[in-house]
Amino acid sequence: MGGGLVLPTRDPPKEQDTSETATNIPKLLKSIPGVKLGQQIRIGYKPGPETAKAFPEFDIKEVSNGLYELSRKSYLGDTKTCCINPSLSYYWEDSKNKIFDEYATGRSLKTCDPLTKTISGSTLCDNILTSLCLDEKSGVDRTMCNEWMGYALNRPDLSIPKSINDRYTKLCSKGANNIVCEDWLHHLRIIGGKENDEVIDNVLMQQTPEFKEKYMKCSFPSHNTVFLAYRVIEPRECWDQECITSNVHFLLSKNYHNLTLCHIYRCNISINNLLIDGKSSVKISCHDENISNKDKPKARNKAKFIDDILGSSFNINFGFFFVIFIMIALILIVLL
């Protein structure tokens, strides 16, 4: 008879969780919102029925042997909410549409589309921010509006800045003395160009007589100032106090550009890092007529100063010089 082989018996090893089987939804609440469109994240064993409600932006799929994953299919964050809150990447929303920072039973994850966070290149927020930034009472952060506008008015698709300018023109033509219109005019000046100059001038020319009298005296000078300007070579914008102290946003383009022809008296000095030794010395000077100095004479009104000089100069008698010219001409004819 043949022999037999008897193997010793052992109890099977106890089941041990791996990183995939040990994980679960509560452990991944901070990681799931960051999953990109089309990407997946493993969530361990089959989740409970509340998972589908908590993560409506994801498909729940079985990977193998009872292990599941979430696969992102969409971003359901409210576009307006995401556009006006640059630091908000996701939030939790309950059945009453109230927003929360943390998860709780009955709340659903709403993730902001990444394009709402890239206003430099994305146009997703343009329509929303145009409407909100136009309304001074909307409560939207003006700093964010300025950042967005700097990009929006330079979009490659020219229909976008045209649409924005049309809406601002309609508003600001009725009155430009507000932060909304000043910010817009400021950005148009920065971008520059003949087309933007025409837009600005069109808006400013439609302002009321009261507005022009109060804020645009540089662009609409008095008769005496115009008469004086004809007698001075330097551009009027350089010495007329109404130009020097004016709000540059309310200057017509001709006056605005003439400011660049003036000598620069005001300057800013900024030093981030300066290393010097014992033999070195630094001397910094910045002319500023607004700085009070007892040793310096009081700054004069430039326009009045020029007018005084011209007024004290002798008057030219053109008739006398004409007679002299004729006499000299006759003498030269006789001599020749």
From Swiss-Prot:
Family, similarity comment: Belongs to the poxviruses A16/G9/J5 family.
Pfam families: Pox_G9-A16
Superkingdom of source: Viruses
Protein name, as recorded: Protein FPV127
InterPro entries, sorted: Pox_virus_G9/A16 (IPR004251)
Disordered, as annotated region: 1-22
